[in-house]
């Protein structure tokens, strides 16, 4: 696997959780002898919702909500077999979505 790279993309709603998970991945990869590029913070996606609080009248009474999605990107350069095994066994937090691609 010396000529392949692993691209890891993390998504979460909590920035503290995603940064902690990214740090765990970087430490695991470096401990097994691979080099890591990142974590690179990608732009935060903000979804805004406006909801009427009154069921019938009072158009001016509204609540506004925002949902932020944080994304981090990492490249593991020249991973070894130990690196792949360690990354597969790694237990990350429940609120983090992990997507892995081989380049």
Curated annotation (Swiss-Prot):
Transmembrane segments: none
Pfam families referenced in this protein's UniProt entry, alphabetically: Ribosomal_S10
Keyword terms, alphabetized: Ribonucleoprotein, Ribosomal protein
Gene Ontology CC terms, in alphabetical order: ribonucleoprotein complex; ribosome
Gene Ontology molecular functions: structural constituent of ribosome; tRNA binding
Alphabetical GO biological process terms: translation
Annotated InterPro entries: Ribosomal_uS10, Ribosomal_uS10_CS, Ribosomal_uS10_dom, Ribosomal_uS10_dom_sf
Signal peptide, first to last residue: none
Protein function: Involved in the binding of tRNA to the ribosomes.
Family: Belongs to the universal ribosomal protein uS10 family.
HAMAP family to which the protein is assigned, alphabetical: Ribosomal_uS10
Assembly and oligomerization: Part of the 30S ribosomal subunit.
Protein name stated in the entry: Small ribosomal subunit protein uS10
């Amino acid at each position: 696997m010396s000529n392949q790279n692993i691209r890891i993309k993390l998504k979460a709603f909590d920035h503290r959780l995603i940064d902690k998970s990214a740090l765990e991945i970087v430490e695991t990869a470096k401990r097994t002898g691979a080099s890591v590029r990142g974590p690179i913070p990608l732009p935060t996606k903000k979804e805004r919702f406006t909801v009427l609080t009154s069921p019938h009248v009072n158009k001016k009474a509204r609540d506004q909500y925002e949902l932020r999605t944080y994304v981090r990107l990492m490249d593991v350069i020249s991973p070894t077999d130990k690196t792949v095994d360690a990354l597969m066994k790694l237990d990350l937090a429940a609120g983090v979505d992990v997507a892995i691609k081989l380049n």
